Amino acid sequence: MGTIGVPLTAHCVVLFLLQMVALSTEQFTVNGLESPVLVPLGGNLELSCQLSPPQQAKHMEIRWFKNRYSEPVYLYRNGKDLNEAIVYKYVERTELLKDDIGKGKVTLRIFKVTSVDSGSYHCFFKDDKFYEEHIIEVKVTATSSDIQILMHPPNSTGVRLECHSGGWFPQPHMEWRDSKGEYIPATSKSHSQDENEFFNMTMDLFIKSNSYWSAACYIQNFVTHQEESISFVLPGTKVLLLKNIQSIFQSSSVDLEKKDMLLKSIKSRFQSSSVDPEKKERLLKIIQSRIESSSVDQETKALLLESIQSSIENSTVDLETKVWLLESIKSSIQNSSVDPETKELLLERIKSSIENSTVDLGTKEWLLESIQSSIQSSSVDLGTKKMLLKIIQSSIQSFSVYIGTKEWLLERVQSSIQSSSVDLGTKELLLEIIQSSIEGYSVELGIEELLSKIILSSIQSSRVDLGIKELLVKICQSSIQSTSVILETKEWLVKIFQSNIQSSSMDLETKVWLVKFFQSSIQSSSMDLGTIKWLVKNVQSNIQSSRVDLETKRMLLEIIQSSIQNSSVHRGTKKMLLKVIQSSIQSFSVDLETKEWLLKIIQSSIQSSSVDIGTKSMLLKKIGLILRSSIVNPGTELLFQIIQSDLQSSSVNTETREMLFEITQPTVQSSSVNSVTEELLEENYQLLLQSSSVNLEAENILNDTTQRILQLSSVNQGREKLLLDRIQQILQSSSVNPETKCWLLKRIQFILENPSVHQEKKDLLLERIHLILQSSSVQKETKSLLLGSIQSILHSFSVQKETKYLLLEKIQLILQNSSVHQETKDLLLKIIQLILQYSSVHEATSKLLLERIQLILQSSSVQKETKDLLLNRIFSILQNSCVDQGVKYFLLNIIHPILQKTSVHQETKSMLLDRIELILQSSSMQQETKNHLLDQIEQILQDTTVHQETKDLLLNRIELILQNSSVQQETKELLMDKIDSILRYTWVHQETKDLLLNRIELILQSSSVQEETKNFLCNIIASILQSTSMHQEKKKLLLGRIELILQSSSVQQETKKLLLKIVQSSSPSSSVRLESCNKRNPFWKKHALDLGISVFAIIVVTLIRHLNQREADQHFELDTLWSKDTSVILCVLIMFNNRLKALIYFRLYGYSPPGKTYKYIVNYILRFSQPLFFIVYSAIILVMHLQIQNTDSLFSLYNSWMVEMIMVLGLLLAIFNVKNIATALLHLGRTTLRLFRIKD
């Protein structure tokens, strides 16, 4: 059972690819930083922008520019940084960070920012024709805190102050203000800029005597709105009066009533806003010294404190006065020389002020600060501190105290706990207050948050020693585990722990205590499930939080692992922890390293023998839910690595593997599976195939599964594409062993051969084959295997014609692609050659392949080298005697349409003609093949649609063949025959014949041509000249070439002799002799004999008819005689003389066309007149014969003889001139019927 686990799961892993959904990102938006972005002058600027939705941007154009599109700050295109296109002022000052370009995110970095770098920056993405941009506003700024006020020596009128500050950008706003914050006009202002573009500001103020006692210099940056200021206080003088007031209070001789009046006066001064603050400060110093003095009686002190309290509580008293009052209280409390009764009076006043709702919050804050400083002071005795803490505790727990006051109280407690200057005993007292407040029912709910803040900040603070932190954690732990504490309180206590764990400022040791607390609480059997739920939630949030450091997360994950694997932990707790794992894996916010640890927990739990089967079952169910979830993110790829390692691991038992298979099966069948999950799963499939640890049997099962997937009609096309992508990657990978590739290619072959598989799927598969063969990164051995499969597919009878057509289409595209390696093309062409050489290959397949070859050769986009390779293969096919003659015929039939097309490149035609030459010169080539090739050559030269330049190239090759001594004589004779037939054909273009005669002339002039070849060529010339069917114009052209050859000195004597013999042997032919020797003789001299015979025959026949008619008392009609009998005789004569035919035609119709028109009409008569005349006149005579009733007359006998003669002549003509008769019948028309005027 252990060995079956891998194949079963591999099968399931591949089936999972059925749920893949192809993603396409045709459009996008660009997001980036919010404007404005502030950057310090001279610093470095980073501007980021991101494609939404995230997608690959390597292939896109990424352009950063400021004002003009054509002036880029940075340009990235086609995967390259185009530094030469950058504007000169940004050269070597910018760089593009492309770490996340796969997600569509880039960052522009500008070094040493200057003032000109301010402005709008455009982040521009362009994909093909679609583009988007995001604009970011950048503002360069600089702020300085270095402000100085210089006082010049005073004079009789006043004093001059000078405020100076440097290091600002842009130019800031600068002004003077008085103590009340009101604007004072400056005497003068000035500014300057240094070499770094920073502004240096200077401002003067002249203060007259007794006008202002203080002034402040304010500077504000317009961009950041940041303010900096410095104050200057002029020295005061009125001190004597204050000294007198102090002596009154110290004197025991002054009665209490007077002191009371004085205090009221002081109080009114304190509460008055018109009194100079300096005077108030002096008064307060007097009061403070009296309170602290032991010589002052208790009643006086009470009066003093009462006046202070009323001033503090009075809302009309300004804040500065109150601050001074409270400072005096604070120093009195902290003064060890002050007696306890006085301190107690002070604290009572403080408490009543804190609890008084009419006292403003600012005053209470100052009071609480005084309490805090007193608690923290080591000079304050423990009894005083206890009294202070009682005030705090009673105030916190009191419902009458405002919540804001309690907040400040607790903040003071917090600062005291965190202070290193506070002794441990004081801190323990403070912690007791916190604990009693947490566990107390009388504390209102708002205080819980305040207490949590104290605990949180105290635990996080590095200033708090570990002992106090441990005490705080214990307080929280005991409160959480206490049944008397309500659930809401426990909830916020757990939140405290969570925030402490997430804090980056928290030291590791404290976090260890917190994590141990979580572990003990989760694994505790006495803990209620509600509390555990909150604890688990916090563990989850800490794991998923990006603020928690990795080490803390690792500790939390160890808790989860130990809890899952611990048999004593409740099942419900384990379920909650597994949910945490599931949600964390699925979460986008969780980093990959955390997920990796989570999955290691899963892996160790699955592989662990100590974990019970129930826990494993729950764990695997969660894996199934993750796989089937539509919210899985790319980080989940780690899960598939775990599945893969578990399948390959020998430590995983069979039962666990079976469960893994059971949870994977419904995942494959689920329609809600996310496309990312599908892609990850099929990547895992690829890794399994590529892995050397997976045995061949498992790979075979995986490939079988692939085959079945692609054959199913219900499989989504997008998912098929993803599967095919992986097949392509496997075949392209050099790490995959050849056996795996071989198995995979067999499955591909089976798919293509299967007629039940949809044609679209086959097309997708063939598209991948196409890409693999085009790729230069694919190994030659892989390509050879693939091409072997292609060969067997085309060779197979069971493969559908459409599939073969698609495959051949892909082959054509590969051969046409200039980026494909030439070696790959050579391999492909070898396959083509082998296919065509097989006699068992279906004829339809061969035809399809030959069509593709024709298209490749005709295509202008195919490289010359590729065509050369292809033609070499064709040549070797034609040379092979084993190849079926029908296939060779097909190949040769390609030549004509290629040469015929004007769109085919001339270079391609030249290459093809080179091969024709080689074929005809080859001694190993079968004669039958050569015959068929020569037929093709003949057709090409006869074809008027073939370009003249192409024919010229062909005739060049014929010339070279005839001149070549290595060419067999039989081949040359065949070629000569074709030349003969071309020259004889009347429909062959004259220009073509002229080209051919040029070549004949060159051949006969050449000394390298064999004598035997020349003899054969001369015999052809002789036969042409002696032929009666050959047109005189052709003979003229031929004789013209002979004349040039005989005149040439370069022609051998033997050749000339041969030609002269031909001319002499052709001399008996009257037509040739007369045409060549006496070109200027008139027409009647050339045809005198024919004309004489014709006239004599007409006279004889006319006399006989005249005598016959006289005997029969008939009226003689010359027109009737001409139209019946004479025309018959003329018809016989016309049959033997071409010129006479033309003469009769032109004379009868009274028309003699000039020039070429005459020539064309003569050619027309030559072709069609003979059979037409005889057919027409035979029909006329036959009708006449049937109309004659007197059978005894000579006329009847004459007509009978004429009918027989006409019929015999017509029969002979039909036998020897079948082709002309057929042509005449096809071209029968009115003009031909009217050659002679026939009358009844």
Curated annotation (Swiss-Prot):
Expressed in skin. SUPFAM superfamilies: ARM repeat, Immunoglobulin. The chain crosses the membrane at residues 1087-1107, 1126-1146, 1168-1188, 1206-1226. It is a multi-pass membrane protein. Gene3D superfamilies: Immunoglobulins. Residues 142-231 form the Ig-like C1-type domain. The keyword Cytoplasm does not apply. Glycans are attached at N155, N200, N314. Disulfide bonds join C49-C123, C163-C217. GO terms for cellular component: membrane. Residues 1108-1125, 1189-1205 are cytoplasmic. Residues 1-24 form the signal peptide. Residues 25-1086, 1147-1167, 1227-1240 are extracellular. Belongs to the SKINT family. This is Selection and upkeep of intraepithelial T-cells protein 6. It comes from Mus musculus (Mouse).
